[in-house]
Amino acid sequence: MCSNEYPWVCGVDEAGRGPLAGPVFAACVILDPASPIDGLADSKTLTEGKRNSLTLAIKAYSIAWAIGFASVREIDRLNILQASLLAMKRAIGKLPVTPARVLVDGNHSPRLKFPVTTIVRGDSLVPEISAASILAKTARDAEMMALHRRFPRYGFDQHKGYSTEQHLAALKIHGVSIVHRRSFAPVRELMANEKDAES
């Protein structure tokens, strides 16, 4: 990271804590006050098309942005909270500039060498965090589409790994894949039931 003399504020958010499959992603964004971006909001309130168009604007007009993730294996080894914080730390570590302050959505933050403030519902309240939520969501959705091409039987293109009826039905039919989170209760219980059936 390069040091700088500007009081740049970096927003950080994650995407994908709840799904049964796929990595958890995080993004960080330093917005440029001279180039405001209209329409920033919590990514969950935006359509896919709006998220995609805002992603292009964020990448084009922000001072800096970066994306990180933690793998399914790391999620199962660390737990989803710690894996989310790891993804955030990785994203921040990729920034080409040093922020003066980091604003993190929620009430947990990674350990960093900069001042950090957690903000509950920050993705709805703070433009930098809104922008980060959008980048994290679109990056994770793109990864789930790539996983769908590898594992089409699970329908990741439809539910992005979340615990829908379609996904649970596919798990019961096809079993657990290498991209499923084995520490998550529905997956863990399915594996236990399969083991009981074999014994």
From Swiss-Prot:
NCBIfam families xrefs: PRK00015.1-3, PRK00015.1-4
InterPro entries: RNase_HII (IPR022898), RNase_HII/HIII (IPR001352), RNase_HII/HIII_dom (IPR024567), RNaseH-like_sf (IPR012337), RNaseH_sf (IPR036397)
Keyword Cytoplasm set for record: yes
One GO cellular component term noted in the UniProt record for this chain: cytoplasm
Every RNase H type-2 domain range: 7-196
Protein name: Ribonuclease HII
Its biological purpose: Endonuclease that specifically degrades the RNA of RNA-DNA hybrids.
Main subcellular localisation: cytoplasm
Keyword list, A-Z: Cytoplasm, Endonuclease, Hydrolase, Manganese, Metal-binding, Nuclease
Cross-referenced Pfam families: RNase_HII
Reaction equations catalysed: Endonucleolytic cleavage to 5'-phosphomonoester
UniProt remark on cofactor binding: Manganese or magnesium. Binds 1 divalent metal ion per monomer in the absence of substrate. May bind a second metal ion after substrate binding.
Enzyme Commission (EC) number: 3.1.26.4
Essential cofactor(s): Mn(2+); Mg(2+)
Gene Ontology MF, one: manganese ion binding
Binding site for a divalent metal cation: 13-14, 105
UniProt-annotated location(s): Cytoplasm
Family, as annotated: Belongs to the RNase HII family.
Gene Ontology biological process: DNA replication, removal of RNA primer; mismatch repair
